[in-house]
Every structure is written in structure tokens, then in C-alpha cells.
Amino acid sequence: NTKLYKVMCYSMKNGGKRLRPIIIKEVAKSLSLNKNQFLKSMIAIELVHSYSLIHDDLPCMDDDDYRRGRLSTHKKYDEAQAILAGNSLLTMAFNLLAQDSNPSLVELLSILSGHEGLAGGQSLDVDTIEKKLNFKIIKKIHEQKTARLFEFCLAAPFIISNKSQKEINMSRKYGKIIGTVFQIIDDVHEYENKDNEYINILNVMTKDDEIEKCYRYEIEANSLREKLLPNKKNRMNDILSFIINRK
């Protein structure tokens, strides 16, 4: 029960809505997977998400003192412990996935959380602060920092179910849409609350345009859902509606 473990637990206990593991669960249930088959993927994605939030809040990154109404990990403890806690959560995620003996899951999450995904998006975010913003740059940052992990949430159950590569690719596209919508709505809320960060889509686009885009994405996502999960009862449509309409 080391100090580092306590720091890790502190960040995990401030987990918000747990939306990412919920999505894995809903898709997995629709594919008739049992809990033991997808539980580690649920935990792994939340570990990676928590690691990203710890590092995102650091002074050298977004420099946020609070996360969901509580002190950020580096403010509650210190920067060194926060960095180590984030590193430990990330490695723990891959430890869990490796136990499932499905290398495709490990491969996908490593791609989506590494330089081609989450970490790469954060690098672009930091590098863009001193540069002129445009839609293409912000879209790229949001796709990598946010949408990539949602890709894993949708694709993991299809990988576990040994579905075709075509279906896995479609599920990743579905996840990318959900993640993109999630970030657009986040940006809208930040803009309206005057908690406006530099990397915000509403700094280069209008709110009405982005909300309209979300509804177009919803139609595309529902079309993919019907192809991937035909005649399956699930809450994926409700989840996407919740993301768009959340306050």
C-alpha cells in the first residue's frame, strides 16, 4: 500500500461517468459476450483514460489545478508522483490486456494511445499553443486526444468476438464518430461557461455549425450501428443522444 498506489487510486476514484467502459459493456452484451470476456478491456480503457487526465493536468501540459471539482493529482500530491502514477496506470492497462491472450487488443490500444493517437494528440496540443489555429489542426488534435480511445471501446468487443476485419474497421469508424461528437459538445460547454481553452473548435467555427454537425454524425452513427448490430437490443443510440444533449 505504497504512496504511489494511493496516488493512482486518488485519480481513479474521480472517474466521472465511466462512459468508455459502459460503451464496451453495451456493445459486448449485444454480441453475446460474457462478462469475463470483456471485463479487462473495460478496466484497461478506464486506466488509460485516467492516466491521460493526470498527465493532461500537469503544469507542462494544460496546467489545470482542478479536475471534476477536486484537486488535480499533481496538486493533491506533487508532480513527480503524478507522473509516476500516470505511467503506472498506463502500464497496468497493458498488463491486464496481456492476461487475456489476445494480442490484437494490446496492439490496437497501444496504437490508439501512443504517438499515432492519444499521446500524439497531446503533443500537437502543446505544440499548437504558439501557432495560429485552424479547423484542420483542432480536428486532428480532437481526433487523436479524444476519439481514438472511443475507437477502442467500439472495436474491442468485435475483436474479442473474432469478427471480420471489415466489421472491426466499421466499429472503429463508429467509435471515432462518437468520440468526435463527445469532444464537440465538450467544447460547446467550455465556450458557454467561459472556460474557453485555446484548443476549442468554437474558436474557428460557429456553435450552430458544430451542433448541426453532431446531428449529422448521429445519423451516420445510427446507420453504422444498424449494420454492425442488426436487430440487437442495446443502449448505444441512447448513449449517443445522451452525449449530444448532456448539460
Q: Which residues does each predicted region cover?
A:
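Mg2+-dependent prenyl diphosphate-binding active-site environment of isoprenoid biosynthetic enzymes
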Residues: 2-226, 232-244
